[in-house]
A protein has these predicted regions:
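Alpha-helical interaction elements in eukaryotic regulators
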Residues: 12, 37, 67-70
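A short beta-strand-loop structural module common to alpha/beta enzyme folds
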Residues: 26-36
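Short intrinsically disordered terminal tails
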Residues: 1, 100-101
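N-terminal beta-loop-helix "entrance" segment that forms/cooperates
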Residues: 37-44
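Residues that form ligand- and interface-recognition hot spots within folded domains
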Residues: 8, 31, 69
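Local sequence-structure signature of Cys/Sec-based thiol-disulfide redox active-site neighborhoods
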Residues: 1-28
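Structural micro-motif
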Residues: 44-55, 68
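Non-catalytic, surface beta->alpha helical segment in thiol-disulfide oxidoreductase systems
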Residues: 55-95, 99
């Protein structure tokens, strides 16, 4: 599952959510409602922008994907390699090959 920390009025957050919906990728949006929450997640996740996107790799562990541009890049690479069938497994595989070196 992809987990996103999002702001309701953020166009990048909306783009990331739309991309996941269009590709039928299982995800959960956590809406950040207050400035206090925003500052907490920025500090906790060590990211200054939104959306903050993570991939669940097992029951208790999540891997940071990054922001909207990172998600778009990974999905586009998956599509170029695997065609229109983008799955959570293919995103994980591409992420590992693109960023874990």
């Amino acid at each position: 599952m992809i987990v996103l920390y999002v702001l309701r009025t953020c166009p990048y957050c909306n783009s990331a959510l739309q991309l996941l919906k269009e590709n039928k990728i299982k995800h959960k949006a956590i809406y950040v409602e207050t400035n206090e929450e925003k500052e907490l997640y920025k500090k906790q996740n060590r990211m200054n922008t939104f959306p903050q996107i993570f991939m669940q790799v097992d029951r208790d562990n999540y891997m940071k994907v990054g922001g909207c541009d990172d998600l778009i890049e990974i999905v586009n690479v998956c599509k170029s390699v695997r065609g229109s069938n983008v799955s959570l497994d293919s995103i994980y595989y591409m992420y590992q090959n693109m960023y874990s070196k």
